[in-house]
């Protein structure tokens, strides 16, 4: 149920080492005003909806099926939020959840850990976040990475995200780090909006006086210019956790950007990390997205093992899930990473995965 796409030897070793281990799940929430740009994302039908996507996903992740929510899941043009996949699996498998607010407009209405960050300005400003905030969030990431690793000895930590517009800030980080990512990233749209993303990124890097890129850019300054608050927390968390335990960066484009950021930070700031213990895990809808090139992107970053769950919705009775097979939604809130964990740690089959996810979707449908 798990495919290794790059760095096959490292990926297979990582999977073998963590087979039957019980993971911990961390989800880092963040917001960037980049997500409010018209048509930038399908994670919410309108810009107004997208203000609340991360908060609504977080509320559903923690509460599951309830009769009412403070922030109901926003309507999507097609399909359902990937949080249905994540919630179904963490609930069924009783995986511990740690929810982090790295920087949101509004705090989530459920128990969470506030890291003292702020929501990011649109990356087109070239001034997404103050450098003091970036440094603070990185230290918070290091602190919690070390703390969670202690709770997961001889196991692994799943680090996930929920940031609307995050594949665009990911493209900005990758581009700023000198990685050829144009035309290779993914999005929640069935056809990735590459031209729009590239134009936005060029504007932001130009405003920050980083474009054209003629020399290496300090990674902290880069995130401060065109990034989002999740990225630097995830990087710090993975760096610290990798010193003691395995790390599964659960996501596609966004977590590949985090991995590239990790490499830049440990190079520029001599932070110790064990990159052999860090892999990126996503869905096959991302890994095999014909409108992007996730595998090529991972190869361009270098020395990162890209894994993906083989989870399929082709035979699903739920049309909201079958639409994933047409390229809608694809990933988010650690959905791919949780499906990988279900197969790796608990031996779940395609049938078990589908049954758990469909049960949750149907329960929600019956209630409303």
Curated annotation (Swiss-Prot):
InterPro entries associated with the record: Nict_dMeBzImd_PRibTrfase, Nict_dMeBzImd_PRibTrfase_arc, Nict_dMeBzImd_PRibTrfase_sf
Single annotated GO MF: nicotinate-nucleotide-dimethylbenzimidazole phosphoribosyltransferase activity
Family per record: Belongs to the UPF0284 family.
Family matches, as PANTHER family: PTHR38811, UPF0284 PROTEIN SLL1500
Protein known as: UPF0284 protein PCC8801_3324
Organism: Rippkaea orientalis (strain PCC 8801 / RF-1) (Cyanothece sp. (strain PCC 8801))
């Amino acid at each position: 149920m798990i495919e290794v796409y790059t760095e096959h030897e490292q990926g297979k070793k990582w999977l073998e080492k963590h087979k039957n281990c019980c993971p911990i799940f961390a989800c880092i929430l963040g917001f960037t005003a980049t997500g409010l740009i018209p048509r930038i994302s399908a994670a919410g039908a309108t810009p107004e909806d997208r203000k609340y996507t991360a908060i609504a996903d977080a509320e559903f992740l923690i509460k599951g099926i309830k009769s009412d929510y403070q922030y109901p899941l926003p309507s999507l043009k097609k399909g359902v939020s990937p949080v249905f996949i994540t919630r179904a699996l963490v609930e069924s498998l009783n995986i511990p959840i740690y929810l982090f607010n790295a920087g949101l407009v509004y705090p989530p209405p459920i128990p969470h850990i506030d890291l003292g960050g702020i929501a990011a300005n649109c990356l087109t400003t070239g001034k997404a976040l103050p450098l003091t905030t970036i440094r603070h969030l990185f230290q918070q990431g290091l602190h919690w990475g070390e703390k969670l690793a202690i709770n997961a000895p001889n196991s692994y930590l799943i680090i996930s995200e929920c940031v609307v517009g995050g594949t665009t800030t990911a493209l900005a980080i990758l581009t700023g780090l000198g990685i050829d990512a144009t035309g290779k990233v993914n999005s929640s749209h069935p056809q990735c909006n590459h031209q729009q993303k590239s134009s936005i990124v060029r504007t932001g890097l130009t405003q920050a006086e980083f474009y054209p890129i003629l020399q290496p850019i300090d990674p902290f300054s880069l995130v401060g210019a065109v990034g989002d608050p999740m990225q630097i927390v995830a990087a710090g968390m993975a760096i610290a956790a990798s010193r003691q335990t395995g790390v599964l960066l659960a996501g596609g484009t966004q977590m590949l950007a985090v991995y590239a950021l990790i490499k830049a930070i440990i190079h520029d700031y001599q932070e110790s990390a064990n990159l052999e213990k860090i892999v990126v895990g996503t869905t096959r809808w991302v890994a095999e997205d014909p409108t992007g090139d996730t595998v090529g992107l991972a190869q361009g970053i270098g020395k990162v093992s890209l894994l993906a769950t083989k989870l399929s919705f082709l035979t699903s009775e739920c049309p909201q899930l079958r639409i994933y097979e047409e390229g809608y939604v694809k990933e988010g809130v650690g959905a791919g990473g949780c499906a990988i964990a279900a197969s790796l740690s608990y031996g779940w089959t395609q049938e078990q995965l589908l049954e758990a996810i469909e049960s949750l979707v149907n329960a929600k449908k019956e209630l409303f």
